[in-house]
A protein has these predicted regions:
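Short coil/turn motifs at secondary-structure junctions
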Residues: 13-15, 46-48, 60-62
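Glycine-rich beta-strand-turn "strand-cap" elements at beta-sheet edges
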Residues: 2, 42-51, 77-101
Length: 101
């Protein structure tokens, strides 16, 4: 079982969450879909904060997560999304011990 995961919280500038998602859809969704090292990926809006996006990613291993940071689509995503965010994301690494498949 792939056991490396990331919980990520992004905070968009007020009123910019949909714009952040549009950038994510353009660059990240296709890159993630085509990346076999992304085992699972969940992208969602916070139910209690209109500016927060929460993400869970599971990779085959930590090295694969680091390698994805050099993907051209990820670099383009960062260039366009950074001005829409209130700061750097909160990122927590986790060892996935179990998942329901």
């Amino acid at each position: 079982m792939a056991n490396f995961g990331l919980f990520i919280t992004h905070r968009a500038l007020p009123g910019q969450r949909d714009a952040v998602r549009a950038v994510w859809e353009r660059f990240m969704r296709p890159a993630i879909t085509e990346n076999p090292a992304h085992v699972d990926y969940f992208y969602g809006f916070s139910a209690d904060d209109a500016d927060v996006i929460r993400v869970f990613q599971r990779y085959v291993d930590r090295d694969a997560s680091q390698a994805f940071l050099n993907h051209p689509s990820y670099r383009a995503y960062l260039d366009e999304v950074t001005p829409l965010l209130a700061g750097s994301p909160d990122v927590s690494e986790v060892a996935v011990m179990w998942s329901k498949n």
